[in-house]
Amino acid sequence: MDIRDLHTDAVALLPGHTTEQGASRRTALQAVLGLGYAAAAMPIMAQTAVTTDAKGLKEGWVTVPSNGFDVPAYVARPAAKKNPPVVLVVQEIFGVHAYIQDVCRRLAHAGYLAIAPELYARQGKASDYTEIAKLQAELVSKVPDEQVLQDLDATLTWAAKAGGNVRKAAITGFCWGGRVTWLYAATGRVKAGVAWYGRLEGQASANTPSHPLAQVTQLKAPVLGLYGGQDTGIPMASVARMQEALAHGSKAAQASEFVVYPDAPHAFHADYRASYREAAAKDGWQRLLQWLRSHGVA
């Protein structure tokens, strides 16, 4: 993704854009310039962060072989369920941290083998960065879409060997991963996708030659887009352009839907941030589960 798009995304997800919970513009600026993931979490984390236990689950870290590289991945699955359907979980820009792992456990409790590969692993570790600007410039912008899609293919291959039912596979992703969700829904490897506030259009680059808006004619799985009406990084005009394109796209594109939460900012599902909006997050989660069931991923 072009570094300008990444900067816009980072500013949108910071707590400085959530003034009613006490975060100021100064806080946001500090976070962009140097406080990284810790700044995105802020003290609000202790108040709202959801912790899902692993009772009845098998969970932990595994390695996924992909083009000669072992990609670390966090996986959670029901301990007693054979051949569970598979959900690929795609990270935010911060990598597969505690929140993304918790999302996997939530999906596992719903009956899925949920797996989140570290899609930056070849380029470095997101956890090594304390500054969002450096994280964007030195890591995130260096990750090619082609590599990401191939690693997701390899993750499905691993899941199949581990007993997952990849004939009933879906993908969901947040922010950076929301964009990836749209792209992967065009590959034919999944039956459905749920994209949480993923960028829909932007500057093309060598590593990100195309964006979701340009791929609606290639979409092979219907996607549910969950977006915030107050997202400063993804204007509603962009959502409207995507909706118009979907209406004239492939069969899967025409079956895709958007839900916009008028008062929600970017990252409204991220319960460890000040951007968290409980009502929108819970409603979106129920819509995710229903979307998967209604498209045969259950």
Label for each model-derived stretch:
Residues 1-23:
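N-terminal secretory signal peptides
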Residues 22-27, 37-51:
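N-terminal twin-arginine translocation
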Residues 48-79:
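N-terminal cap/lid segment of alpha/beta-hydrolase-fold proteins
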Residues 83-92:
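Short beta-strand element of the alpha/beta-hydrolase
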Residues 130-172, 297:
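Gly/Ser-rich "nucleophile elbow"/oxyanion-hole loop immediately N-terminal to the catalytic nucleophile
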Residues 154-215:
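Primarily recognizes the serine-hydrolase "nucleophile elbow" in alpha/beta-hydrolase
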Residues 219, 225-227:
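Short beta-strand/loop motif that positions the catalytic acidic residue
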Residues 252-298:
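C-terminal catalytic histidine-bearing segment of alpha/beta-hydrolase fold enzymes
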